[in-house]
Regions:
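Pyridoxal 5′-phosphate
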Residues: 1-172
Length: 172
């Protein structure tokens, strides 16, 4: 819940309080604890999946997706092997803009991906620029993101859709 969180402080590390008064929370944060928010935070923590298991699942999906995407003529994978497994960035050279593919995927297949990089909505991605990608590649890049809810079947549908779109629009 908004307004509630946890802070883990390594032994020996001293932090200064942001507000003063009261002796609660080892003099770091004064005030009355918000019990409903704390209960909500506890419920959110309990709802978290096993992070190791989730990371393994996502890593497997990423490897599966990359193997399928590499087989599609007309797709180049921008993401390096050491990139986050939660995201794959691809480039389709035959399209003038990534927006064309985005719209086609969402309107006709119910598949939602993004363009550019997550940290650069509406402007050139500093992440893709730092990867030394050209402006053309950056403009035509698509970002595929994974969550714990995705399956190999989702990836198969995406790859089928991308193949269809590339065939349908040989050059736009």
């Amino acid at each position: 819940p908004k307004g509630c969180g946890a802070l883990y402080i390594r032994k020996g590390v001293r932090i200064l309080p942001r507000t003063f008064g009261g002796e609660q929370e080892k003099k770091i944060r004064p005030g009355t604890e918000a019990s409903p928010l704390i209960a909500g935070f506890g419920a959110a923590v309990d709802a978290l999946p096993d992070l190791k298991e989730q990371h393994q699942h996502i890593s497997e999906l990423n490897a599966y997706a990359k193997s399928k995407l590499r087989k599609i003529d007309g797709i180049i994978i921008n993401s390096g092997e050491d990139a986050s497994p939660y995201i794959i960035n691809i480039y389709i050279p035959t399209f003038m803009r990534s927006q064309t593919v985005l719209q086609e995927l969402s309107a006709n297949y119910g598949i939602y991906v993004s363009n550019g990089s997550a940290c650069a909505k509406g402007k050139k991605s500093h992440v893709l620029t730092a990867m030394k990608l050209s402006d053309e590649i950056i403009d035509k890049s698509l970002r595929i993101s994974f969550s714990r809810y995705n399956t190999k079947n989702d990836i198969d549908k995406l790859c089928t859709a991308l193949t269809d779109i590339i065939k349908k629009h040989p050059r736009t």
